[in-house]
Amino acid sequence: MLENSFQRELLEAGCDEAGRGCLAGSVFAAAVILPPDFYHPLLNDSKQMSEKNRYALREVICKEAVAWAVQEITAERIDEINILHASFEGMSLAVQQLQPQPEFLAIDGNRFYTKLKLPFQCIVKGDGKYANIAAASVLAKTFRDDYMLRLDKEYPMYGWAKNKGYPTREHRLAVREFGLSPYHRKTFNHEIDQLELF
């Protein structure tokens, strides 16, 4: 069972992102403040959940959270400042949208940089430990999946409805055949490994 938050003295927001390892599309970051008594049996790291459960949980989170926000950082911006800084920027911008403003941040991952004057704690695999980070993980993932489904209608040849922009063999082969779309991250390696051809 997940702990609700990392600490209980200060109003805490859990933060996570989705799409960091993708070849195409924006990265999405989310920040969520949950009520202290929030519990849902399905809530866990979004990568461990079925798609159906993720979307069902998104409805619950959006309805029951004290506050939530999702922020998109485009592929163009990722190429400009790099994916790590784009993830940090996305989380910071999501936090700034929260009302009420949190007093503490619980961040999924091993590092974080922000200009926000807020204390924070980085937690490796935090989305499998704390409900507020898991909730942020669900929002970031589902909002990003919706976005990739929209892009897939424009560029069906890359299989984004299925791979969501991640570097699958099929996605890399499509890049080799059709070249890069305007939504591909130009600074990422799109080459297919020779071993993947066999």
Where are these regions (language model features)?
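RNase H-like, Mg2+-dependent phosphodiesterase core
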Residues: 1-198
